[in-house]
Amino acid sequence: MILFRLFTTLLCLSAFPLATTASADAPAPDGATCRYETLQVPALSLAGNKTGEATRQPVYVYLPPSYTESGTQRYPVLYFFAGYYESSDIAYLARGVEATLRQHEFIVVSINDVNSLHGTFGANSPVTGHWRDFFLTEAIPYIDAHYRTLATADGRAVGGFSMGGHVALRLAFEHPEIFATLYAVSPGVFDEHGLENAMKTWDQTFLNAYGAAYSPNLKKPFPHADYPSMDGSPEDLAIRAKWKKGFGELPQLIDAYLAQPVRLKAVALEVGMKDEYPWIPDGCVYLNDLLRTKGLAHTFVLTGNRHEFDAAIFEEGMGPFVARQFAKLAKPAAAAKAP
């Protein structure tokens, strides 16, 4: 499914319509407010890193208005990941998130994915720490233990922007047993020539973060990474293969996903036609074509946006899409012992 969204208008160009299931949740009363909480979550997966990352990491939680009124109801959760060099503190999305949560009952959780190099890429690295493990084995279980969540794949969505969109996409396709819904906005993904084109737009700061995540080498000086020379030498080609694997190797990712017994329930990709980094829309179009070729149902949204994510994009795109999927769930049963 390909959609064009220009400003607030949605134009469906596919024979397959969007799901029109309305939320089963009643809108919150006028004046009802969401609650925003900041946590410090144990992150032992990061122990021993070489970049000074703390073994407690911030996690930000938006609760719908009804959460404080009902002591037993459990809620589905959208896990969100921020872009490179951005804050994982999603207070800047307040208008869009709160408008969505006043209409639909789910929790939004932003797990920190930004480190001292300004981006983790959700990678397990001997340099920056095992961030993927932190997300999956520490942060999400912590949320399930401390909030009244629907701790099932159907009760979890994952989304993100740019680097965070890449994190969300990898998590979803690699772990459909944990997440059932994906919404990635301008994710970092490569087509066949993505690395070469992207290298033209990356500054040294980004190269350092990407290299430490995907081509770590503790024998090298800080930030302990190997960099491709792009000269075609055997050493360069070996390093380049590691760099391509980061945002690339999408056919391998999808083939590995198809080999699993579990399928995602809903997938959406959104990208702006005016993105300042042309390799990103090129990569998204490539991924869209790949998914279509593999017969995997998904929604592809082209907008008039630049490389950006704000409250309006959440309210008009990610929020409603996730809400439609959660609305298909049966009304959550009361929890016998709700945290």
What are the roles of these predicted feature ranges?
Residues 1-3:
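N-terminal secretory signal peptides that target proteins for export/translocation
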Residues 23-339:
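Non-catalytic cap/lid and distal C-terminal segments of serine-dependent acyl enzymes
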Residues 6-17:
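Bacterial N-terminal signal peptides
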